[in-house]
Amino acid sequence: MTNTFSIGNNMNVGLGAPLLLIAGPCVIENEEKTLEIAERIKGIVRDMDVNFVFKASFDKANRTSIDSFRGPGLEQGLAILGKVKSRLGLPVISDVHSPDQVGPASEVLDILQIPAFLCRQTDLLTAAGNSGKPVNVKKGQFVGPWDMKHVTGKVLSTGNERIMLTERGSSFGYNNLVVDFRNFSIMRDLGFPVVFDATHSVQMPGGLGSCSGGDRSYVPLLARAAAAAGVDGVFFEVHTDPDKALCDGPNSLTMEMLESILPQLLAIRKAAS
């Protein structure tokens, strides 16, 4: 039985809950752009049966190059996410990279996200668990789905059972990822809601030399397959102009693509239930 739990004040994720949508730009570029993207997505999903959580990173600590844009940092980034909450009434999620970030982040964020590259870091997982907030752990590209039992065990050791797991592809040779759709069933059998990160799954890590490439045209295909497989949520990086995005533009969706794919996912989910 998949665990079902609450997010924020009036939202559930898991068995029987509406489709969870985690969406937003890869990184906080500035306050104006962040609020614009959040408001656009909110408008798109207004009449859809989805639970929308806005996502943007205050720091992209694992960019390919030292010259890559990382974001505004913890303090300024959390302030901007706080404005998304207060002005638009949206729950928010962002990455935490070290135990010392968990305290201030948990004062603003509705969900703490553990990056894929850090999914085995015990101190980070237990700190996130001790916050009492829901924890979204992204499965590392190098981790088997069954190994997430040990990852979730670290969070569970704190008494926090509000855990979700996100599939974002597995390393397939150099500079490429592939999605094993068995992973959704395997991780759901661990007892936790499963989310599919469809945009990072088409990423080509380091594929452009000093930054990552990707191909957003495959996102709808993979997302539809994941909906048929019974995922509890989907994760999309979305931008008003992906080709000018400061991070992960090649794999980010346009607003028009998001508006097109969501009704398809809801129809597939209904048919498969």
Swiss-Prot record:
It catalyses: D-arabinose 5-phosphate + phosphoenolpyruvate + H2O = 3-deoxy-alpha-D-manno-2-octulosonate-8-phosphate + phosphate. One of its GO terms (cellular component) is cytoplasm. It is found in: Cytoplasm. The keyword RNA-binding does not apply. InterPro entries: Aldolase_TIM, DAHP1/KDSA, KDO8P_synthase. It is an enzyme of class 2 (transferase). Its EC number is 2.5.1.55. Belongs to the KdsA family. This is 2-dehydro-3-deoxyphosphooctonate aldolase. It comes from Desulfatibacillum aliphaticivorans. The gene is kdsA.
